[in-house]
């Protein structure tokens, strides 16, 4: 078979590991031929691609980012987009398409599959919020990066008797905030699944000061809602999928904490550092397992389905199920946060 791959949406540690494993097994086990479209769906529309061979994928599983680059192109919103994709795939004699991406990218994959394009998906997001899978590659790396930052913030906050608010990624789900906050010993952990109670936040920080610890570390996910200001948007511009760029909840929260408590408060936004750099060993292994299953899905003609992790097994579900809702924290995780908080 002649198979095409692409990566869409934000980059993520482990993408290259998926590409590496899919191509390696496809060539060695199935005798496939591969191309990689550059810059996501934009590359398909522009017929812009590179060959993927055993030689030019050698060692890429160790690297961060994506060798295929990426974009946030929404084929569904481009007049004649679906027809153009079908034309390009036909010109290049493509038998199947493997799309690596989050819910936005996979919404396009599903659309194409429903319109006769043989395609399968691989879930990609550091937010770990794709429905139906226990963990996405890239999440472990993001948590490691965020945890290291929280560790470092402790010493500088302590040295200056300050409160420091650390803003991490997480538009709809607080997995990174939860994991890095717990691992990093944050005094306050705030996630999008629950509205921020500023009085409770301030009470927790005051408890620290009243009991001899004259500093505080707060971890907050970018998608959190603060009743006093709502959801903080970094830009009024939206991408082709209608998403505004979230940024600034950390700064808004820091200002409010300082105003209500009188404690000197600073904010740090970790931003894109969370999805940069080389993937952890766990994400390299997980990414390759996703890639191996993806090429098997192609040969089993499981069109319109997406690879997922269930327990210790890689299996697959329909893309429609995967993007129907976000995988979010529930009461079990709220209880962990509450049990580790000071009792105020």
Task: List where the protein language model places each region.
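Short glycine-rich or small-residue beta-strand-to-loop segments that form or flank ligand, phosphate
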Residues: 2-10, 66-71, 96-99, 164-167
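Short glycine/serine/threonine-rich phosphate/pyrophosphate-binding segments
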Residues: 12-22, 44-45, 79-80, 97-110, ...
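Flexible, glycine/charged-enriched surface loops at secondary-structure junctions
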Residues: 31-37, 156-163, 214-218, 254, ...
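N-terminal phosphate-binding or glycine-rich loops at protein starts, especially the Walker A/P-loop
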Residues: 1-45
């Amino acid at each position: 078979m002649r198979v095409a791959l692409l990566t869409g949406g934000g980059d993520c540690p482990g993408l290259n590991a998926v590409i590496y494993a899919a191509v390696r097994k496809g060539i060695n086990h199935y005798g496939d031929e591969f191309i990689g479209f550059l810059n996501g769906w934009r590359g398909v529309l522009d017929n812009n691609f590179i060959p993927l061979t055993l030689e030019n994928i050698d060692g890429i599983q160790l690297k961060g980012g994506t060798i295929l680059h990426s974009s946030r192109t929404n084929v569904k919103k481009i007049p004649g987009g679906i027809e153009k994709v079908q034309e390009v795939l036909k010109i290049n004699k493509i038998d199947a398409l493997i799309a690596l991406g989050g819910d936005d990218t996979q919404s396009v994959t599903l659309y194409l599959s429903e319109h006769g394009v043989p395609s399968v998906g691989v879930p990609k997001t550091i937010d770990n919020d794709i429905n139906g899978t226990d963990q996405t590659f890239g999440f472990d790396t993001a948590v490691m990066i965020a945890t290291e930052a929280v560790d470092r913030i402790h010493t500088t906050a302590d040295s200056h008797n300050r409160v420091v608010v650390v803003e991490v990624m997480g538009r709809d789900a607080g997995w990174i905030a939860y994991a890095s906050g717990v691992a990093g010993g944050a005094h306050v952990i705030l996630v999008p699944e629950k509205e921020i109670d500023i009085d409770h936040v301030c009470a927790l920080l005051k408890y620290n000061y009243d009991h001899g610890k004259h500093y505080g570390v707060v971890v907050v996910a970018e998608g959190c809602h603060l009743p006093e200001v709502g959801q903080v948007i970094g830009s009024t511009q939206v991408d082709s999928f209608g998403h505004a760029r979230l940024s600034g909840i950390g700064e808004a929260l820091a200002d409010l904490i300082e105003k209500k408590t009188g404690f000197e408060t600073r904010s740090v936004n970790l931003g894109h550092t969370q999805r940069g750099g080389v993937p952890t060993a766990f994400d390299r292994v997980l990414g390759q397992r996703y890639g191996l299953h993806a090429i098997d899905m192609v040969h089993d003609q499981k069109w319109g389905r997406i690879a997922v992790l269930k327990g210790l097994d890689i299996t697959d579900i329909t893309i429609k199920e995967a993007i129907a809702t976000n995988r979010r924290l529930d009461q079990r995780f709220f209880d962990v946060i509450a049990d580790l908080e000071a009792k105020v």
